[in-house]
Amino acid sequence: MVNTNLVSIKINNIPLQVPEGTRILDACRANGFHVPYLCYLKDINEIGACRVCVVEVKGIHHLVTSCNNQVQEGMEILTNSPRVREARKINVELLLSQHHTNCPTCVRSSNCELKQVASDLNLTVDRYKNEYPEMIWTSTFPLIRDAGKCIKCMRCVQICDKIQTLNIWDVSGTGSHTTVDVSHNLEIKESDCSLCGQCVTHCPTAALQERDDVEAINGIHGELANDDKVTVAVVAPAVRAAWGEEFGLSPEFATDRRFVSTLKSVGFDYVFDVDFAADLTIMEESNELLARLQQPDKYSWPMFTSCCPGWVSFAKSQYPELLPQLSTAKSPQQMFGAVIKTYFAQKKGIAPENITCVSIMPCMSKKRELILPGMDSAGTGQDIDYVLTTREICRLIKADHIDVSRLSECDFDDPLGEATGAGVIFGASGGVLEAALRTAYHTVTGENPEIGEQSPLKVLRQIGSFKELEIDIKGVKLHCAALSSLGEARRLIQAMKRGECRYDFVEVMACPGGCINGGGQPIRPSFQNKPKDCADRDQCLRGYDARSAIRFSHENKAVQTLYDEYLEAPLSDRAHHLLHVEEY
């Protein structure tokens, strides 16, 4: 409920009225008074650890942290007094004295919050000796932590605890030796980390980042430089909603087809749309759901989606008893890799071992998914050879000095380049469930369902990122749910275990808002880094769907050809071998 009670305050001698209970920081920013901060995340991390947000309050001797103190009637606040400016400078200088300031070679050089705050404070001289801890980490793990860049803001701790409920990070040491490390003194590879990457996208510096695989692709000895290799790039749906942000381009200009041109300029031989494999996933998953519904007593319910490796990892570590309820369908990434190393290789007369398949994803967990057992369909090595996040591919493009603004648009390659609107919405929370039910409805009734207000898929209620839905297919009502974030997943599972709710089909995405807010996406400023603030990415994908000539996976001609020429039918023996997992 919105608080309508107002209090009268002054900020920099200007009288204002703001809602009672408002934090000083929010009151200042809402009224145009800039207050810097480094640790604050609204409703998540409000601990005043960095002390960069301090302000002066009349009648209080000490400076006050504005992120965790509320306005009060008659309060007079100074945001930029000499005393405040000096305190902020000293606090940031002390942070820099323990920070590895290799800014020119840092992956966050262009969007480091610490660097920006230091610049805004006009810090031009290092007044304190620089000493930072040595980086001791497993360099092969997809998530890298550099202790020399950690400013102890505790954002990662709070995001993992409050949003993802995995508690991977914790505070260790005392006094000046206080730091953040993996909980229970574990190595990161021994922890239950799902590799969702939310700690990375909320870190103000490069203390947390993905393992960089750009050099393996674009280095002097990289895959693109090897004339004996056929290089294939496959692009996830959510990438098109965000890649332009790294170049300051609007979504209207930074289209999927312009991204194809960009990847061709980089040197990839083929560029395919993972939306194709999303359509393929829908064909398998929707038919699997219908097959289970025909023998309801044989299975435990609900059936969960399985395309998000962060969610699958979470289920493995937290609720292994639920694994039989996960769809056996591989993710679109792994389905595509299997098809490329078999069907595509045979069709083009290329030995599978001579194909390098690079998946471009909004996700860090995909870097681990590609090495899981059963992901070697041709018997010649991994189906997907490398995963680059959206951030990594953009760094690669910049390193090649490609002027994206001058490139024209280009279609995805055949024969695996056709996709539907149903495949595009995989990148948004609820999209997988909706796409699957569009095709399930057609399989049962022989007719396509309406899309939009007249759709048989009805939203019964929505709370935050949780949606409860229902669809009537020939008199059979399926009760469904779609949710994002692992904390939401835990709450739903616990509610089901208590008998408070029952569902037939549930979609889970590890990242809040879905893949559009994945751990590998471009990093936005912390005050624009909540799911509601990234609604434009969701709308971008929904727009692609609305404009698509074909909006049903079962109408994808390229998918139909794949079944006719190679897979035979959904859930066939060959389809099961290539497109499904035997066990989790």
Describe each PLM feature range.
Residues 8, 20-74, 80, 84, ...:
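Iron-sulfur-associated redox domains of electron-transfer enzymes in respiratory
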Residues 167, 200, 393-397:
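Mobile "lid/hinge" segments at catalytic clefts and subdomain interfaces of large enzymes
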